[in-house]
């Protein structure tokens, strides 16, 4: 049913009918009736009257000019008189009441959600409010918009506070009054948005006790009993909010407090694991501990000695007699003899010789032959060690078995004397983060200290430098230890020469290094069986017809320059003068030893076209397979 009336301004000289006056009767609040919030909403049939929008009793002007509140008994016998103003006085007074009510909710913490039923009629005027003037409706709209936009809150926070105020506001109502009605006062000002179904489901799932079903927007609901404002019945808002926040913080702090204990329990370090590791690396760790102990002890003793001591007083073999050729150098190192180069380079000794001195300290061991200075070198090292360190070393040696004692023959302690800031004369290869796990000597520089001393050779495993063990270190850490050895005036390097018999016993990861060193040793021994010949090739625009491999600084270390493969259709293929694997000694009168592959290729390209004389070294069929393994 449509209750729309004429929206023209009310004429003060026209008599107001009783039915319109009954709409503003105060019985609306006494009989718990409510004006519908929507324009076409159905009226409450139980009460038979409609509630005023602001909940205040209407007032009309009497003959004396005073406003009088209408009562049901007096509604039929009201004295009418001519008005003194274009607008009735009761309208102005009711508007003042609306303004007073509008100022009250601003004192609450959440003004946008206060449960006042009054402002609903401002946005959606009913039949009685459409008879008012357009100017008064604009004022009411301004007040409504001011109240609405004055409270700017986020939707999610508003939904949380909405559920809290619903729980406090509806606790005083009977259960039966929730049926078929809407949430009172939630949409009172009209500008506040209605609850979406998703938000209502969130309120229901959050466990709020006041979250009720979604109301039908077309059905009205009775307000609470009494004329007191609904905000007076609300308990303080922060209390339930603090409860929700406390529960959320407890839930969030629960797993955070458990994190340290879980982390501590997830990484245990048991004794069984450490014992297994010790059992697996027992032999290797003993060798490393002995070498590191000797290295650190000698290094400490050297640092304590005055710098004026010259090491030329140590008896030794001159450099010229000690290393006439590379083969004699390797043989002397394998036999355990210590070699020194002169007064300023240093000396070296075998750990097996040091063991003999530790077993018989009181007995003076004399050298049988005069061609080596190992007893003097061993005695000098013994003199560097303190009594406590010497006792520890004796205990370590006594606990070793025969197999481990034999491995001491390949371990050498080299002491180098140098200037501050000078390098040791060799580079390192390998590391725990690389394919070759063992730290080895990659290259010995020709004019460096290690080359002058003669003990440290390419392919030797480096156990420690200046008392710092290199076992299990990465490549960068090993290089850092090598750079730190530049500062002192002395350097103590413990190296081990790998052999095919001892390499698998020490560590399985040294197999590759042992095979490479063994192949290089065999290639040195098989030099006597190799044949050196001179061939002549035709140099054309495409080169000599073969490619090179090896050279200084190659991927496999410093290797001799050899022929890799022969190109098809070349003159060298047809003549069969050269073969893959032949080592190039001289090319057009230029020695090729010590050159890189790039330098050798530049020499070949610079040659003029024509015949070129090449001196090659070809190994016999018996020893040809072994050096190929070393080159691979």
From Swiss-Prot:
InterPro entries reported for this sequence: IL-16, IL-16-like, PDZ, PDZ_sf
Polar residues bias: start-end ranges: 139-153, 199-209
Record-annotated PDZ domain positions: 412-497, 534-619
Biased composition, class Low complexity, residue ranges: 184-197, 321-338, 508-520
Classification via PANTHER family: PRO-INTERLEUKIN-16
Function: Interleukin-16 stimulates a migratory response in CD4+ lymphocytes, monocytes, and eosinophils. Primes CD4+ T-cells for IL-2 and IL-15 responsiveness. Also induces T-lymphocyte expression of interleukin 2 receptor. Ligand for CD4. Pro-interleukin-16 is involved in cell cycle progression in T-cells. Appears to be involved in transcriptional regulation of SKP2 and is probably part of a transcriptional repression complex on the core promoter of the SKP2 gene. May act as a scaffold for GABPB1 (the DNA-binding subunit the GABP transcription factor complex) and HDAC3 thus maintaining transcriptional repression and blocking cell cycle progression in resting T-cells.
Name this polypeptide is given: Pro-interleukin-16
Origin species: Aotus trivirgatus
Gene name of this polypeptide: IL16
């Amino acid at each position: 049913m449509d209750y729309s009336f004429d929206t023209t301004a009310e004429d003060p000289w026209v008599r107001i009918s009783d039915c319109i006056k009954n709409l503003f009767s105060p019985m609306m609040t006494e009989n718990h009736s409510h004006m519908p919030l929507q324009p076409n909403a159905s009226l409450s049939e139980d009460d038979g009257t409609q509630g005023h929008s602001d909940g205040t009793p209407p007032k009309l002007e009497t003959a004396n000019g005073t406003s009088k509140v209408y009562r049901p008994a007096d509604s039929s016998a009201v004295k009418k008189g001519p008005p003194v103003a274009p607008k009735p006085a009761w309208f102005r007074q009711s508007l003042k009441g609306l303004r007073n009510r509008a100022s009250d909710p601003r004192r609450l913490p959440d003004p946008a959600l206060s449960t006042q039923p009054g402002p609903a009629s401002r946005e959606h005027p009913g039949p009685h409010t459409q008879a008012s003037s357009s100017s008064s409706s604009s004022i009411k709209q301004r007040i409504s918009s001011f109240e609405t936009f004055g409270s700017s809150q986020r939707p999610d926070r508003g939904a949380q506070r909405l559920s809290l105020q619903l729980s406090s506001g509806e606790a005083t109502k009977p259960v039966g009054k929730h049926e078929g009605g809407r949430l009172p006062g939630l949409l009172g000002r009209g500008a506040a948005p209605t609850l979406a179904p998703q938000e209502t489901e969130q309120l229901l799932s959050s466990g709020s006790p006041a979250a009720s079903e979604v109301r039908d927007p077309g059905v009205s609901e009775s307000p609470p009993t009494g004329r007191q404002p609904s905000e007076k019945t609300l308990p303080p808002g922060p209390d339930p909010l603090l409860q929700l926040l406390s529960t959320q913080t407890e839930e969030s702090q629960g797993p955070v407090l458990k994190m340290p204990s879980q982390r501590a329990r997830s990484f245990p370090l048991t004794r069984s694991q450490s014992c297994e590791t010790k059992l697996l690396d027992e032999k290797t760790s003993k060798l490393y501990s002995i070498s590191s102990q000797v290295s650190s002890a000698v290094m400490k003793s050297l640092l304590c000695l005055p710098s004026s001591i010259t090491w030329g007083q140590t008896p030794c073999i001159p450099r010229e007699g000690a290393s006439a050729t590379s083969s004699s150098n390797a043989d002397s190192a394998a036999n355990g003899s210590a070699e020194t180069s002169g007064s300023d380079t240093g000396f070296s000794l075998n750990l097996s010789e040091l063991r003999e001195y530790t077993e018989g300290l009181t007995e003076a061991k004399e050298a049988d032959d005069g061609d080596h200075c190992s007893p003097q070198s061993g005695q000098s090292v013994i003199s560097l060690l303190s009594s406590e360190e010497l006792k520890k070393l004796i205990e370590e040696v006594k606990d070793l078995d025969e197999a481990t004692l034999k491995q001491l023959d390949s371990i050498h302690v080299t002491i180098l004397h140098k200037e501050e800031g000078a390098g040791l004369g060799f580079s390192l290869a390998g590391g725990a983060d690389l394919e070759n796990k063992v730290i080895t000597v990659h290259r010995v520089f020709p004019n460096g200290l290690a080359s002058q001393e003669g003990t440290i050779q390419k392919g030797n495993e480096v156990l420690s430098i200046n008392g710092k063990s290199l076992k299990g270190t990465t490549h960068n850490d090993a290089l850092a230890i090598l750079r730190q050895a530049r500062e002192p005036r002395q350097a103590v390097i413990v190296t081990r020469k790998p052999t095919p018999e001892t390499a698998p016993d020490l560590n399985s990861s040294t197999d590759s290094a042992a095979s490479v060193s063994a192949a290089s040793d065999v290639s040195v021994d098989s030099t006597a069986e190799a044949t050196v010949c001179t061939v002549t090739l035709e140099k054309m625009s495409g080169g000599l017809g073969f490619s090179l491999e090896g050279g200084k600084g190659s991927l496999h270390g410093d290797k001799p320059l050899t022929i890799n493969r022969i190109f098809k259709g070349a003159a060298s293929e047809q003549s069969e003068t050269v073969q893959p694997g032949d080592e190039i000694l001289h090319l057009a009168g230029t020695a090729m030893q010590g050159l890189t592959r790039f330098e050798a290729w530049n020499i070949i390209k610079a040659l003029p076209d024509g015949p070129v004389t090449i001196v090659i070294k070809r190994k016999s069929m018996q020893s040809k397979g072994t050096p190929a393994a070393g080159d691979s």
